[in-house]
Amino acid sequence: MSQEDEYLSVEQFLELQKAETREIIESLKADGSEPDALYAIEHHLMAEDFKALENAVVEAFKMGFEVLEAEELEDEDGAKILCCDAVMDSALDAEVIDAQVEKLVNLAEKYDIIYDGWGTYYEGEDAEYDVIEDGDED
């Protein structure tokens, strides 16, 4: 969320994430992705402060997530932000992914970083490995 967006409580944000999770899963299935495959669920974390992100990802690792190396990017205003993914292999099960999201949203709240949704890759014989992200349109 940008600073211009209306503030959402953690509970409201989690409800939005649940709806987006179901949309992503339905999009994958509608596109023919293998429903019984194991998917690498990539949860996106962002922070302006390296130490806050570092503390959060150490805790995410202890929760069983694989944490990918952080990258430094610039936002639309030119400010530097650090981004990384916390990854967990999972079935396309909304309740399982909801539980992962809830853990990481609460972690983001604890360390004052941003949980920026999740994405995964299409799985199937014709997979080209396009990433499906929350908020993307078909």
From Swiss-Prot:
Pfam families: RraB. It is found in: Cytoplasm. One of its GO terms (cellular component) is cytoplasm. Keywords: Cytoplasm. The keyword Iron-sulfur does not apply. Its main location: cytoplasm. InterPro entries: RraB (IPR016716), RraB-like_sf (IPR036701), RraB_dom (IPR009671). Globally modulates RNA abundance by binding to RNase E (Rne) and regulating its endonucleolytic activity. Can modulate Rne action in a substrate-dependent manner by altering the composition of the degradosome. Interacts with the C-terminal region of Rne. Belongs to the RraB family. This is Regulator of ribonuclease activity B. It comes from Aliivibrio fischeri (strain MJ11). The lineage of its organism: Bacteria, Pseudomonadati, Pseudomonadota, Gammaproteobacteria, Vibrionales.
